[in-house]
């Protein structure tokens, strides 16, 4: 399935404003039922996912960090990325160009939680030759 113009308008409104189906329908001049059906089709096609997001800036015990990683064997990048993504509290994993192979976005409850993530969970993956951790001190409009 390839999204048409209306689908893209729906996707954009959901992405930027998290609008209700009724609000989107009113903005586009179509029925709420049509919006609901299109969102369902977009979800079924794996194009969109609807979920609740947290703002770590306003929640206690929420530490956002990025962990840059190098992998011993470049041919295993995708496999290692998928393995890392299975670890609890990992929000995303991306393959990079440049100094590091992967960047991991992780949300933990404390510095102790970050240490546990790096020393126990991430080290359990194997084949990781280097890590560098970047702790987020303040985010602007970051929802996870």
Feature names for model-found ranges:
Residues 1-144:
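A compositional/biophysical signature of low hydrophobicity enriched in polar/charged and small residues
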């Amino acid at each position: 399935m390839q999204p048409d113009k209306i689908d893209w308008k729906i996707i954009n409104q959901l992405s930027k404003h998290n609008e209700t189906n009724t609000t989107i329908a009113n903005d586009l001049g179509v029925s709420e039922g049509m919006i609901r059906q299109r969102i369902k089709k977009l979800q079924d096609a794996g194009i969109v996912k609807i979920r609740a997001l947290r703002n770590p800036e306003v929640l206690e015990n929420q530490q956002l960090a990025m962990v840059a990683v190098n992998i011993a064997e470049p041919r295993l990048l995708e496999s290692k990325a998928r393995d890392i993504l299975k670890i609890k509290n990992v929000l995303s994993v991306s393959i990079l160009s440049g100094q590091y192979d992967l960047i991991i976005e992780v949300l933990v409850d404390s510095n102790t939680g970050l240490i546990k993530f790096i020393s126990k969970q991430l080290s359990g993956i194997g084949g990781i030759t280097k890590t560098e951790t970047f702790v987020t001190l303040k985010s602007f409009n970051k929802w996870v």
